[in-house]
Amino acid sequence: MRKFINEITITGDLVKSELEEKTITTKEGKEIEVITGSIYLRTADKSEFEVRLYTNKFKKDSSEETYFYKKYAKFMEDMISIETAVEGQVPSVVTASGCEIRPNDYKSKNTGDVISSTVINGRFLEIESQKAAEMVSKEASFTIEGIIGKIEDEMDKNKNLTGNKTVVLYPIRQKTEDFTNENAYEVDEIYEYECVIEQDLLAAFDSVGYYEGCFVELTGKMVNTVEVKTEVIEQAFGSPIEKKKTTIVKKNVIKSGSVPSTIYDVELTDELVEALKQRRVKKLEEIKLDVGNKKQNNNAFGKVAAPTQQAPVNPNVGYNPFAPKN
């Protein structure tokens, strides 16, 4: 099976860096040196994004330093963040590329509910030159493949229609033992990635014929900012009172998409998708019940075998693996 597209690129001002070099102990009890932590980037619209990074210092069973260790160590040496900049210093403009969205599920300490979100795992870091920093677009973009699970009208918190549509995409996390072979991947986990298609592209979006259950590639912009609204309240006498309301605006805005295809076109089957769904349900239940180690239970249904059945000659294009079962 080929590798599904899952690409995040972020360019922005470096707000702060929490990268550090440290020694950790593996599950096997072996101590290894690593660079780990997060950086925070601010885009032109004042959105801020956390990018998580990790690399071993040495190659396996070798004293040779890894490529990413050298790159991250150099980054830590050269970077200037908004948090640490002194007078006369200009904070670094950084591009994080080759990043991926990953599922992040945890149990709330306050409510006990399972919260499902996504995190950004980074790979390549580049500090833009002064000349490039003046010209580069500071933005966060995504290109992700997955199964469309739901398309519906978007509503605000007061249940009012916004005029946009919500598109729930289900990307599939994969794994491989051979990263040099783009066709040696197998499915591992399915998760939710909510997007929005805004009014100006609705007609074009609807004309493509997307349906719940089709496999697509979506490209767009990521927003994660704070919106402050001021409400002026008139009083019976004296000066009016101003109340400020702060709202976090987090959305993934679709800007383009591929021609829809079926799951069978990418070597998926109904049984394979159903197994991924059940594995997902079981994982969330185990987090809720604090059952064992999440990582150990991540493969509760065993290895998902590669599909062996042939795709139907005339597959039902209306097939939706996420629809409720009767």
What are these regions (language model features)?
Residues M1-N326:
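OB-fold and OB-like single-stranded nucleic-acid-recognition modules
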